[in-house]
């Protein structure tokens, strides 16, 4: 329990009533509870629903820690920005089947409709830049700072 508490940074929440926790804090506690069973695969359905930017960043850090421990995380989400920043692979379900699957850069970079805001803004300048961080890095490398 102590290891998971530290991993998810929830020690300050342990003495609080669940009804007094924010949505993001409840989500972290739910992940902690699941982690007690030592899963090899974690299935998350819309994990960022109702999250603010700070909570999404916290969840992103948690997912990276889980990945570093060898845990596979499968996420179903409509949060394209979150998927582009955190996924190793992205897929599109339609009529019960995966009709497209690729790395985030290939998936979102080559897509006109299902893409990120950064991808839409930069598509005619940088090929396959789908996150803000990628656009900033490409601007720095190309000298396009304006």
Regions found by a protein language model. Name each.
Residues 1-13:
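Conserved ABC ATPase "signature" region
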Residues 17-21, 25:
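Conserved ABC ATPase signature
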Residues 42-45:
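Catalytic Walker B motif of ABC-type/P-loop ATPase nucleotide-binding domains
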Residues 77-78:
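H-loop/switch region of ABC-family ATPase nucleotide-binding domains
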Residues 83-85:
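A short, surface-exposed alpha-helical micro-motif characterized by mixed small hydrophobic
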Residues 97-121:
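Conserved beta-strand-loop-alpha-helix hinge in the C-terminal portion
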Residues 114-146:
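ABC ATPase nucleotide-binding domains
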């Amino acid at each position: 329990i102590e290891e998971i508490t530290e991993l998810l940074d929830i020690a300050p929440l342990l003495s609080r009533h669940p009804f007094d926790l924010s949505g993001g804090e409840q989500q972290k506690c739910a992940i902690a509870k699941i982690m007690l069973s030592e899963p090899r695969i974690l299935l998350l359905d819309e994990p960022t629903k109702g999250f603010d930017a700070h909570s999404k960043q916290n969840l992103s850090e948690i997912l990276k820690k889980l990945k570093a421990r060898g845990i596979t995380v499968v996420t179903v989400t409509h949060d394209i920005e979150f998927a582009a920043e955190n996924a190793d692979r992205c897929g599109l379900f339609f009529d019960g089947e995966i009709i497209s699957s690729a790395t985030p850069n290939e998936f979102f970079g080559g897509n006109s409709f299902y893409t990120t805001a950064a991808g839409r803004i930069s598509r005619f300048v940088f090929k396959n830049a789908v996150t803000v961080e990628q656009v900033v890095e490409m601007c720095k490398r190309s000298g396009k700072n304006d």
